């Protein structure tokens, strides 16, 4: 309901999310080993390739299309037990024009970058953690505008495989 104003989500399926959460609960109850992020919901920017949900990259050209392989970082999240809860909005191709997302603290303002949906989803308490990408400020600016922490790791530390590329030498996850 809140997302009607913030518009943080490009893809969110509540039914699938609740099924994944139930499976995580059952896994924990079974006594099987769990990962360090077991059951933690994580949002991801809609340029991270996924096989089980659309990766539209903010453009109608990719409407409803998925990747044939997950982004490596998505596989790492799954291996750690995290639940990918959905895709957050981005500007078209993570580059063109402002995204439709609004700042959850003032709907008349923008979160300020292509990872706007990621920052807004955390700032509005819709997601505890969200992954974004940055070429020229797309993580740190929206995080700052939305009052949350944006972390930009060392270049190349996190694989960019199966993530829409804007600039090979500048893109960060």
Briefly describe each language-model feature range.
Residues 119-173:
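Fold-level recognition of mixed alpha/beta catalytic cores in primary-metabolism enzymes, strongest
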